[in-house]
Amino acid sequence: MTGKVNRDLFFKLASDLREERLHAAVALIKDLSALDLPDDAEEWSYVLNRLIKGLSSDRNSARLGFSLCLTEVINLAVNMPPGQRPKGLESTNEFLSTLSTILNVNVNEGTKKSMKGKDERGILFGKLFGLKSLLNEPLFSEIFVKDLEKGNTEFFIRFTEQLIDLALKKNWIKEPCFFTLFQTMKMLLPFMDESSAEKILLIYDKYDLTLTNEGLSTYLLLKYEGDESLIPSVLDLKNPGWKDNDPLARGNLPLLTKVLRNSSVIPDANGGLKETKKQKNTNWNPRLHFVWSVLLPLFGNGKLENTSHISKKRKKTNNKKVQNSIQFPEFWKMAVDESFFNEKASSERKYLGFLIIDAAFKAVPGSYIGFCFSQNVMRTLINQSIDSQRVLNKISQLTLDSIVKACEEDSANRLVPCLNAMLFGPHGSINFDKLTKSGTVSKLIAIKELPSTVLAQLLDVFFLQLQDKKGVLSHTLFALDSILHIVRAHKVEINDMDIMKPVLRPIVYMAFFKHTSDDLKLEQLHELAKERLYSILGELTINKEIRCKDPEINSWQYLTLKLILDIENSHVGDLINPLDENLENIKNEAISCLSKVCRSRTAQSWGLSTLLSMCLVQLYAGDTDSISVIEELCEFSKHENNSMVGITEILLSLLAQKKALLRKLSLIIWQQFIEEVGLEELQILLDILKARENKQGFAQLFEGEEEFEEIKEENDASEDESKTGSESESESESDSDDADEKDEEDEANEDILNIDKEATSALVKALNLPDNIVNDKGEVDLDQLEGLSDDGGDDEDEESMDDEKMMELDDQLSEIFKRRKEALSSISTGNQRKFEVKQSRENVISFKHRVVDMLAVYVKYCEKLTLANKSEHSNNLGGSLSKLVYFIIPMLKCVNETLDRPLADKISKLLKGKIFKIKVTAFKDMNKDIELMDLLKKTHKLMLTSKPGQHAAVFYSMCSTSSLFLSKLYVEIGGNDKLDELIDLYTATTKEWMQKGKCGPNIFIDFINWLSSKKQTVMDKE
């Protein structure tokens, strides 16, 4: 009885599930192995036919399953003794014949009925999969490798010819067939010799494939991919071929360009080669041909010979041994830039060009990256990227993204050459991001985790621009901005001063010193360079852990000062703001103090030296306000036991300035002195929160006591009137501001009237008119003027002005009107006054924000103390936490009075989210002299105010949590006996609340809930 394989397994071989296909193949091979030959020869033939026919299925999963199983069936037959093998598998050659017979596309020849395109496609791809089934292990080694090792190339040559025949059937199967052949040759490369390589090349010549992308890839594989070239020096070719049988020989560049462009090349009348039209029936494929993956890496593997460095004498002696190959720059220019990105190139060709750029960035070494940004490439890239309606806009944007990705993956070799070529190369532009609307340069600069060497090289690119492009304002400004962006993106990684020092030096020179040939453009750079320098220092200041060869330099500000001093002492340039004798003495004394401070390595000395260095830099910048600060810092450094009040006021003065660097620096230095901060220093900060957010408050904070007193006296009356009739604090502020504005407007109108009177009197005098022609209001009496005109009409011919008198009168009139214009310009208009009021309010609010930031630093310090819970901190813990209770009332008042919601939210977050989150048990050692009950009463008084301000919900919520927090502290320190006092206080508050309170009942509910939680504890103790 003959055996049979399970027919259901053939259906499972076509499954979309990989595991099911695999199990079906294993089961079918088991069934087939159990059959006996020659009894079951018919079943073997059925299986072979069924598997080969199954390859022509239009389902890809079916082709995969049947191809996998076919490999195992062939392998099973090959391992049988000769003579016992099944029909169709007697040998591998017989299998090729069987495959061609079953999957024959010409089966309908001679009949009127033609094969459908779908069926033809299935048969051709089925045959390809049938041939590929021979390439799976272990069949591949059994058939191909063993034959080549024996020097037998018959089957390999037949296999090659069958693949080529199949490839030439239809254009849509051409590339898959040739890629399969290429992969086969690549696997057999270690076992091939010159003879087998020659046979392959002759087959390519036979089919006229030498000068095609497929032929090119084969030549490159045989010549450069192996340990040595397998291409013989002489080939008997019938069709045109490559010069010296090497596609990359220098003389082959024009021909190589035409081949890569997929153009047909034929011999001309002179024995040369000429390009013809594109091959017929060639379908455009939006994928790059695999020849590029072979060609591009060759330019970086060192196998291409370059004799440009060899002396002429050596060239003459070794001319026969050394061959000059095409190098990447010339290849890219002709084969890519002038071919795929030519102005007349089609969109399809340019599309492939963008794919070539992508492939080149991944394949070629970093030294060649710059050549990729050639003229036509840059033009096309910019033109296609700038407009989203362009045909190639999407692929151009994808190309830019792939460039960024390639630089991210290999920043050490690709980032700097890419940026250099993109921005400063022969075809680059500093406006690349703007031209392409892509932000590519910004992304490249911001690549994370760059090695220090790459970071130094990146900064060096823009440093060279500062050196080479001194006279070009746009380049210099771009270089300054780019350096700032680099520092901003990598400020955490920049901890070595040797990286930044070469870059900072030209910026310092540009900011503080005159150039030898200063013109108007370069003068503009002084201020720009100074601003960028301050911004760079502001970014770098956050990194305190820095390395420097000079141990004395401990901050970026000190390094900047050192650079200024070095340039000044070298007499390279003159200071823009030269120092007089008095300032020189102040500077020298400050530098002496700075040297002494730097010898100490404490956090406080670092803060003091950084602050002193920054003030000296400001002195060189012409900031006269820094003089008093320098003197105070020098005096502070001379004494060991100093009050922190002076430093606090200095930091506040820096905090009030517009420069972000000074604001950031003041907070950082405040952190260094935070352990020494006492209640007196904190009270200075808390007093600022009480300042009114108007011109009066601005004068109080920024203009000194005298100016504040004057403004206060002028505005007292109007403020009292506005306060008595208002329903809320915001209305009071508004009425006060309106009154101030009205008074200022009346005063301004009076000044304008006086100026007009003076101008009119001067005009009357200059024109020799009677004094009484001007009335009390400073206006000209028109009736009198007409009378004078009538009286003088008869005598006008008697007397007339000569030219000299006319010129003199003209000068007098010009001077009068000039003085009037200057006087009027000094008077604020209505819009100017409104702007000044708004600016004053914004400045006060902004200053309060920064003060809250300083208070937050102290709160954070207290949090660290409580978390540390160390014995060495136990004595200091109670004192530090005690000061926090003094924050409550000033902050509540600030929220009640402020017009700025973000400020109210920030204070609320600090109180409720930080201070009140500290466990009350940590306050057990706090100062007993603090009157907590007094603070509670003040809190309740604020709670019952009829003017909760513009942020009533935030204000009342803070009052409730503040009262509850103070109540918990009161009980924690005084014990449960204090609960009665708290209940009495809340009872009294409840009575007042019933009569005039505007807050909600949640304040009392929160207290009751807390009492409920304490009740059980009290009962347990009793």
UniProtKB/Swiss-Prot annotation:
Plays an important role in the regulation of rRNA transcription. Binds near or at the enhancer region of rRNA repeating units. May have DNA polymerase activity, but it is not required for in vivo function. Keywords: Nucleus, Phosphoprotein, Transferase. Its EC number is 2.7.7.7. One of its GO terms (cellular component) is nucleolus. The modification Phosphoserine is found at S789. Belongs to the MYBBP1A family. It catalyses: DNA(n) + a 2'-deoxyribonucleoside 5'-triphosphate = DNA(n+1) + diphosphate. Its main location: nucleus. PROSITE patterns: DNA_POLYMERASE_B. The keyword Cytoplasm does not apply. Present with 4490 molecules/cell in log phase SD medium. InterPro entries: ARM-type_fold, DNA-dir_DNA_pol_B_CS, DNA_pol_V/MYBBP1A. This is rDNA transcriptional regulator POL5. It is an enzyme of class 2 (transferase). It is found in: Nucleus, Nucleolus.
